[in-house]
Regions:
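Active-site loop-to-helix "anion-binding N-cap" substructures in soluble metabolic enzymes
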Residues: 1-227, 233-260
Length: 260
């Protein structure tokens, strides 16, 4: 199967992009592996005629927006991010009517329809920087309430209105799960994604996007880590750091949308 995929890729001048959370077999045949923002930039720069995106629907939409003349293929059309649909366009209009000085800041994990109605699109790694630099006092942060709260805690000078959405996978991780793993591996620092609940962020050793967590591990002299994000990232971590050990909350955070 792998040889057939590589043959077709060459024949059709295609590029394969895979998110860190995609299954290992998808990452193995991909030309590029990364987070949604990195892959969007790669898609924009690519000279391929066809973009095969191993991720969820909003990622394919973003690639198509950036490359309207290219064919974008999604291996699984049912792969969808629940959080991307946790705010409706009508909510944005209501907020604009309520606040005259309002900027709608949209997390990249959202539908194309929401992005079109927003003022700026951000990632988990640049959200704080962009919100802080906004000339607007009032910020409607969509769709993730948890990331929105984290941004609000770091930019207290802004009035950040938070939408009630979340990543079900990150939101399912509990303090009790972390404490149990920490008791078993006391020397492993807790690395956590900002989509996790605030009480988890408070006891973490490092907070960062998926790419930032991966970079932290690569740069650290330590040899064991507790990883609090979707466990698909384990493939990249082990591949790049075979001598290091990684522990996850139990049960492992696993998104069915990516593993389909």
């Amino acid at each position: 199967m792998k040889e057939k995929i590589l043959q077709l890729k060459k024949e059709k001048n295609a590029v394969i992009l895979a998110h860190y959370y995609a299954p290992a077999e998808a990452q193995e045949v991909a030309d590029y592996v990364g987070d949604s923002f990195y892959l969007a930039k790669i898609a924009k720069k690519s000279t391929a005629d066809i973009i095969v995106f191993c991720g969820v629907s909003f990622m394919g939409e973003s690639a198509k927006i950036l490359n309207p003349d290219k064919k974008v293929l999604m291996p699984d059309l049912t792969a969808d991010c629940p959080m991307a649909h946790m705010v409706k366009p009508g909510q944005i209009q209501k907020m604009r009517e309520k606040y005259e000085d309002l900027a709608v800041v949209c997390y990249i994990n959202s539908t194309a329809e929401l992005k079109c109605q927003s003022d700026v699109c951000v990632t988990s790694s640049n959200a704080i920087k962009i919100v802080r630099a906004s000339p607007n006092k009032n910020i409607f942060f969509i769709p993730d309430r948890i990331l929105g709260r984290y941004v609000a805690s770091q930019v207290p000078e802004k009035n950040i209105i938070i939408n009630d959405g979340c990543c079900p996978i990150h939101a399912s991780i509990t303090v009790e799960q972390l404490k149990k793993v920490k008791a078993e591996h006391p020397n492993a620092p807790i690395l956590i994604h900002p989509e996790c609940e605030p009480e988890l962020l408070e006891i973490s050793d490092y907070i960062g996007s998926t790419a930032e967590l991966i970079d932290y591990v690569a740069d650290s002299p330590l040899d064991e880590f507790m990883i609090c994000t979707e466990d698909g990232v384990d493939y990249k971590l082990i591949t790049d750091n075979p001598e290091k050990k990684f522990y996850y909350p139990n049960p492992h955070p696993c998104c069915a949308a990516y593993s389909a």
